[in-house]
């Protein structure tokens, strides 16, 4: 068996394969996840990603200042803020993961607890929006953050990946 390094060194005259879109879902395609019934979730997803990206960028700047490593900024009153922002980011990531569960679109498409699925999608979206709105404040209120950290607490390690 060739290693990745061996494969990279070999000439590029091998067959080129292009994967096709397929799914274990109905008909072998993505109709369950890409149809008019569930299309509403995609703009929501992209807005959540944009909020995550913005907060991550802000977090990087604040974390650099607090560590004293960025532009010679001394450690000081902002030292606690990066930890709080990281908690907000971690919970937003959890909410985003829960939002992306393929079950919701499946349930809506099959009209199997569709209202529950829509409620869950809307709930996770609203959670991300509320967390973001609070996280960008100079002195964020962590009440909602604490509540959601208890309620939607999957992947406790997710903050380490940010």
Describe the function of each predicted region:
Residues 1-68, 72, 76-162:
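Active-site and substrate-binding clefts of carbohydrate-active enzymes
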């Amino acid at each position: 068996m060739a290693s990745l390094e061996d494969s990279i060194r070999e000439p590029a005259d091998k067959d080129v394969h292009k994967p096709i879109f397929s799914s274990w879902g109905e008909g072998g395609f993505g109709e369950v996840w890409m149809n008019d019934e569930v299309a509403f979730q995609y703009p929501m997803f992209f807005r959540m990603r944009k909020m995550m990206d913005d907060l991550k960028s802000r977090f990087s700047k604040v974390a650099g200042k607090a560590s004293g490593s960025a532009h010679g900024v001394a450690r000081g009153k902002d030292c606690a803020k990066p930890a709080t922002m990281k908690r907000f980011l971690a919970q937003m990531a959890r909410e985003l993961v829960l939002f992306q569960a393929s079950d919701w679109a499946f349930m809506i498409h099959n009209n199997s607890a569709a209202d529950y699925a829509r409620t869950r999608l809307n709930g996770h979206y609203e959670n991300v929006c509320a967390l973001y709105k609070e996280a960008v404040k100079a002195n964020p209120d962590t009440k909602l953050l604490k509540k959601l950290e208890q309620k939607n607490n999957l992947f406790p390690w997710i903050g380490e990946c940010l």
